[in-house]
Curated annotation (Swiss-Prot):
Family, as annotated: Belongs to the ClpS family.
Protein name: ATP-dependent Clp protease adapter protein ClpS
Source lineage: Bacteria, Pseudomonadati, Pseudomonadota, Alphaproteobacteria, Rhodospirillales
InterPro entries xref list: ClpS (IPR022935), ClpS_core (IPR003769), Ribosomal_bL12_C/ClpS-like (IPR014719)
Gene symbol of the encoding locus: clpS
Region (Disordered): 1-21
GO BP of this protein: protein catabolic process; proteolysis
Summary of the function given for this chain in its UniProt record: Involved in the modulation of the specificity of the ClpAP-mediated ATP-dependent protein degradation.
UniProt organism field: Rhodospirillum centenum (strain ATCC 51521 / SW)
Pfam families per record: ClpS
Length: 108
């Protein structure tokens, strides 16, 4: 046998081409927070939670009571765009009904 055959250094090389998968970063998440006030009726807050956050009556009532007792509560966690939209929707809806209800967002 020739030396080149022993070492396998000569001739065409074969290999596998591996495509690098791009690393996709998960989007940052934001909490939509509802703030307590002394003027917005509890039933209105429950309605907002059901309408804009798809909460059932029991869960909406639980969140409303948490906001009432602690001053602030989480309505949900969303991507920035969704959280921002929900805050705007809630604030606009509250103003239309002449309630001072406040919502804000905070990075999770």
């Amino acid at each position: 046998m020739a030396d080149s055959d022993k070492h396998g250094d000569e001739g065409p090389s074969t290999g596998v081409v591996v495509k690098a998968k791009p690393k996709t970063k998960k989007p940052s998440m934001y909490k939509v927070l509802m703030l307590n006030d002394d003027y917005t009726p509890m039933e209105f807050v429950v309605h907002v939670l059901e309408r804009f956050f798809n909460k059932n009556r029991e869960e909406a009532t639980r969140i409303m009571l948490h906001v009432h007792r602690r001053g602030v509560g989480v309505c949900g966690v969303f991507t920035y765009e969704v959280a921002e939209t929900k805050v705007t929707q809630v604030m606009d809806f509250a103003r239309q009904h002449q309630h001072p209800l406040q919502c804000t967002l905070e990075k999770d």
